[in-house]
A protein has these predicted regions:
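Short, compositionally biased
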Residues: 59-70
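Glycine-rich anion-binding loops of enzyme active sites
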Residues: 1-59, 184, 196
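Glycine-/charge-enriched secondary-structure boundary and capping motifs
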Residues: 14-19, 69-82, 86-198
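Basic, gly/Ser/Thr/Pro-rich low-complexity segments located predominantly at protein N termini
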Residues: 9-10, 32, 55, 63, ...
């Protein structure tokens, strides 16, 4: 058993006495090609890449919202929420093709942007401004979530983040579809997120 980030608790989904088996894969990399988040410095640029939906996190809350508000989304919108988690291998492959070595990557899972970025930034932080998430079904769900809690539960339309040197930002924006600058690294702990225009 390899227990780690992909060991999920799913209250209300997996009944008692049932064991769910899941598959996973492990990648490998030459040591010389590994990236080191300890190299991040103020001024480094956060590039956010679009998510396809809520991906694999926040579903206990989503199910509760749907149970309490069964007509909040129609069947087609519900199916759109079930898009598989995007894996962002295209972004990583393009970064290598463009000779961009990011300082760090973050897959935005449970805990949203704040938790997934704060865990490796140490004494640094950022004030992030993300685009409005143009996903009708997701927005209907989010109307039932506390405005601040949404940032700490969901990916809010940004499923992957690369932190790059300022001189690499233009190339990094071309890596995979959906890249956008969402902020820069600063001194001082804490990730604060707002939606552009709110």
């Amino acid at each position: 058993i390899l227990a780690g980030g992909e060991t999920a608790e799913m209250p209300g989904v997996v009944p008692e006495s049932i064991v769910e088996l899941s598959g996973f894969c492990i990648g490998c990399c030459e040591k010389s090609k590994l990236i080191d988040p300890k190299t991040v410095r103020p001024g480094d640029v956060f590039i956010g890449y679009k998510s396809d939906s809520f991906h694999a996190n926040g579903w206990s809350l989503i199910r509760r919202i749907l149970e309490e508000n069964p007509d909040v989304v129609d069947e087609e919108e519900l199916r759109s929420l079930l898009q598989p988690t995007r894996l962002y291998h295209d972004v990583v492959a393009d970064m290598r093709r463009f000779n961009v070595t990011p300082k760090a990557y973050a897959h935005i899972t449970g805990g949203g942007l704040p938790e997934n970025l704060e865990r490796f930034l140490g004494d640094y932080g950022a004030d992030l401004s993300i685009p409005y998430w143009d996903n009708t079904a997701a927005q209907k769900i989010l109307k039932h979530v506390d405005p601040q809690d949404r940032f700490n539960t969901f990916n809010m339309g940004i499923g992957w983040v690369a932190i790059v040197r300022p001189e690499d930002a233009e190339a990094a924006l071309k890596a995979g579809p959906g890249g956008t600058v969402i902020g820069t690294l600063r001194e001082g702990r804490g990730i604060h997120v707002k939606v552009q225009g709110e």
